[in-house]
């Protein structure tokens, strides 16, 4: 039951170097997830080193520049005790694996057909702001239902009032109105590293 994870990608740059975007922020986010799930915090420097070692060991599997493909890196941690009771595990494993993946948007970037979900993804003061496996397991029914009905993704609104957009099942939401960038402020959505970077850049350049 105690499982948290991160996800990032290794890219081949135009000059041939292999790069990975801000793994230090993934390390910090996993530390927060571990604390919330009563798991021992994996040291952030060791997290980054494990990611770098995994990329180096799989360098031959990093797709070439211009292909749109990447090497997906998945660090994850989980309890391994053989216990029945509802309590934190005594032993844990931290692992990292990598696999080549194609472009996230197959066929290029295109508009998505989305729906406002009737179900809630996370509750106030719950676990929506950490990258816990349970959050994604709970959304499987809803995303399968959306696909069966012709939608690409679900838009989740706040569980308390159901009046404010929060995020999709797989990403944060950002709106651009003129020269203004607008993104939901909520304690029940995952703090996206991509969103953080876009907000930072917008403050400098917009």
Regions from the language model: what does each represent?
Residues 2-8:
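Conserved phosphate/anionic-ligand binding catalytic regions in large, soluble enzymes, centered on
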Residues 8, 155, 173-175:
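Short beta-strand scaffold segments in enzyme catalytic cores
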Residues 11-16, 23, 80, 100, ...:
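Short acidic-glycine loop/turn motifs at beta-strand connectors
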Residues 23-149:
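Extended Lys/Arg-rich, glycine-bearing segments that form polyanion-binding/interaction patches
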Residues 163-185:
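Glycine- and Gly-Pro-enriched alpha-helical subdomains that act as flexible
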Residues 188-191:
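Short, contiguous acidic and Ser/Thr-rich linear segments
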Residues 196-200:
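Feature representing long, continuous alpha-helical segments
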Residues 204-206:
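Conserved small/polar residues in nucleotide/adenosyl-binding loops
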